[in-house]
């Protein structure tokens, strides 16, 4: 028994060493989402119509092609944001750290769109380390394009400084989504194949410049509705204090998104979807859980959600009678209770309980795909391991 005990101890110590290395923690702040703002103002239905979105019958269609098409609704519910600094001296921006895309972009001083007037803008002339690249880029968001030019400068995230990082400077931002959003830009953490314009992503440069001890990062999203205290993105490893039990390592099936295989989706005791397997992505840049619209419509009916002012909601008094929804992944069950997948809000002094599921039509060849967004990640600590091309999941500690 003694050799076995020694072996187990060594494996435990190795795992802890790998986990902790030198961790660089990026605090994530939780703010009110754009959907909640629009709902409180009674403008949500108008928003759907102005963007030609049908959120009840089907939803937004997304024809993904190497990451140049991003579904608009992905960012409607975003609540967790961090800070990135660009240039010398630093110019600070609030960004979404998004595992579902691979570019860094922020508004440019040359942008004339209403969204840019409502947010900080990057001034290249004020940075002594800025380098002009000059290439143009374009990312499709829903019904409009975000366009701009690519520049290069030093980019800092909580003490990690990447030299010569190419990033997008937006000169045109579409629609109203970015006008009212809490974030200024997006920092993508997906694979290089998703990067628009062949730009090397920030995390790839962190690895290449030996800024992280281990080629991985991890995400913990607090369930605390008042500011999300403790939420963080960790570069260079993971923090075992944020989860219970051990990590279940799931192979990445396609390197672009952080894409994994689903073995099934169970509602209550019944496997309703993916009984023969399907594909999903773990995405910090999507707040809800999305899936093929017809499947999501069936799921909404199964949990008792009904259309209400352009979105699905349930009677808040029925939560204790609603079924659990379980995702079967790599032999492990990941169960969300109704309190996890129903999102409460207060509208005109009345309690509103919205569904955490949303239809999203991701067309071939990238789709169909399910997206496990923040509703899922809040309950399951997520580790993104580039060294072994795998995702680690474990129950998050509240």
Curated annotation (Swiss-Prot):
It is found in: Endosome. The gene is Ctse. The lineage of its organism: Eukaryota, Metazoa, Chordata, Craniata, Vertebrata. Belongs to the peptidase A1 family. May have a role in immune function. Probably involved in the processing of antigenic peptides during MHC class II-mediated antigen presentation. May play a role in activation-induced lymphocyte depletion in the thymus, and in neuronal degeneration and glial cell activation in the brain. It comes from Rattus norvegicus (Rat). PROSITE patterns: ASP_PROTEASE, PEPTIDASE_A1. Disulfide bonds join 111-116, 274-278. This is Cathepsin E. Its EC number is 3.4.23.34. InterPro entries: Aspartic_peptidase_A1, Aspartic_peptidase_AS, Aspartic_peptidase_N, PEPTIDASE_A1, Peptidase_aspartic_dom_sf.
